[in-house]
Regions:
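Active-site-proximal alpha-helix that buttresses catalytic centers in soluble enzyme cores
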Residues: 1-266
Length: 266
């Protein structure tokens, strides 16, 4: 049975345009795993926010993109090519929303003759708004006779931790405090998946592997509103360190294999 690897990221607009950003944001915010509200609330809210935020989102996307191609599309496709070259197994890049959707990647893999599909979400730590949403979408497309294997997480995988430590060795300064900044989620969602515990485990393993006395966990991209989000925020902690006289800090973001727009811009 022929095998195929499918990498799945959160998603990206298909192109650098306000229209593509609007479509992407509307699809993203319409997902009940992202906005846990009734459809009659979630759908119109997604349309309003997408219309208002499209231009600002495009401006942020342009900050991190190169050659007119959205950064996440380029990064995930490049990773797929490298994995295919390393393993000899055809590898496809897919996104939960926007460019190159999951259904399209599965169809391309089927057309190549694959019937054994190995899915790897680009999220080392499991959260309902990322891993769970991707898993639900993936298994909606399974056909009889096909094998679907899905990696839930890899927050404590030895190869992943070693890769993080190697990157720190290239760019980090052990004389400075180190912050591991993860994408925040509402506290109410964290309890369903153990996401924050997985993030803290990653940070602890990174500290051990890189020979650091400590790695502090901070959070970014809190959306505010009535929900309580995981904290402290990365910006607040950096401000606190600066006020205490610290003149430099290492920041590592181990939460997305290919990044996401908010993480990279912030």
């Amino acid at each position: 049975m022929k095998k195929a690897f499918i990498l799945v990221n959160t998603g990206s607009p298909a192109e650098l345009s306000a229209a593509a950003c609007k479509t992407f944001l509307r699809e993203f915010l319409s997902d009940p795993d992202v906005v846990p509200a009734p459809f009659f609330v979630r759908y119109p809210l997604a349309r309003v926010i997408a219309s208002k935020r499209a231009e600002a989102y495009l401006a942020n996307l342009k900050k991190i993109s190169r050659g007119g191609v959205p950064r996440l599309v380029e990064a995930c496709a490049g990773l797929a090519r490298k994995i295919a070259a390393m393993t000899g197994t055809e590898t496809f890049a897919a996104h939960r929303y926007g460019a190159f959707p999951v259904a399209e990647a599965i169809r391309a893999a089927r057309d190549s003759g694959a019937r054994d599909f190995r899915f790897l979400p680009m999220f080392p730590q499991s959260a309902s708004s990322t891993t769970f949403s991707v898993k639900r979408e993936v298994f909606a497309h399974r056909r009889e006779g096909e094998v679907f294997r899905f990696r839930e997480n890899y927050f404590d995988d030895g190869a992943y931790i070693s890769a993080l430590a190697a990157l720190f060795g290239r760019f980090g300064d052990r004389s400075l405090p180190t912050l591991a900044s993860f994408h925040s989620v509402p506290v109410s969602q964290d309890g369903k998946t153990g996401y924050s515990a997985q993030c803290r485990k990653t940070a602890g393993l990174l500290a051990s592997a890189a020979g650091l006395a400590d790695v502090s966990v901070v959070w970014q991209s809190q959306m505010g509103g009535p929900l309580k989000w995981l904290g402290p925020s990365a910006s607040a902690e950096i401000g606190r360190l600066s006020a205490s006289g610290v003149d430099g800090v290492n920041v590592v973001c181990p939460g997305f294999a290919c990044g996401c727009t908010e993480t990279l811009v912030e």
